[in-house]
A protein has these predicted regions:
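Alpha-helical residues within the helix-turn-helix
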Residues: 32, 49-50
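Beta-hairpin "wing" of winged helix-turn-helix
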Residues: 51-66
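Key DNA-contact positions within bacterial/archaeal DNA-binding proteins
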Residues: 39
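Non-DNA-binding regulatory cores of transcription-related proteins
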Residues: 67-136
């Protein structure tokens, strides 16, 4: 359901949430601690900075930090920048025609799953995830 980029963005955001208030964290350290390839992480963080989700500081004491309190940042905000502009709607059973008007056998169930998943990302904050996730 999530792309690798979205998974990495969530992983980085949760880790930054844990260190919120401790000052900036170097990208190399964040990459090492989260297991995300450094170059890939840099591109993800660049997008997060552009969206105002992460603050970036240059220099010896520089690094990245979550821009807001983890309780105020919903997971949807983290994954949205990495959502394809036009996500093709494919039938889970592979039918060429599948819609609300012409549904396949799994259409309604799959639609409910997607709606619940979207609601989860809309209403769950980084702090919520941190509370249930052990440290890496």
């Amino acid at each position: 359901m999530l792309s690798r980029t979205q998974e990495y963005a969530l992983r980085a955001a949760v880790f930054l949430g844990r260190s919120h208030g401790d000052g900036p964290l170097r990208t190399s350290e964040l990459a090492k601690r989260t297991g995300i390839p450094r170059n890939y992480l840099s591109k993800i963080l660049h997008q997060m900075v552009r969206r105002g989700l992460v603050d970036s500081e240059r220099g010896r004491r520089g690094g990245v930090a979550l821009s807001r309190d983890p309780a105020e940042v919903m997971l949807r905000e983290i994954i949205a920048p990495f959502q394809p502009a036009h996500e093709p709607k494919r039938c889970v059973l592979g039918r060429p025609e599948c819609s609300d008007e012409f549904p396949c056998g799994a259409h309604q169930s799959w639609k409910k799953i997607k709606e619940r998943t979207e609601a989860f990302f809309e209403t769950t904050s980084i702090a919520d995830v941190m509370a249930e996730t052990p440290l890496p």
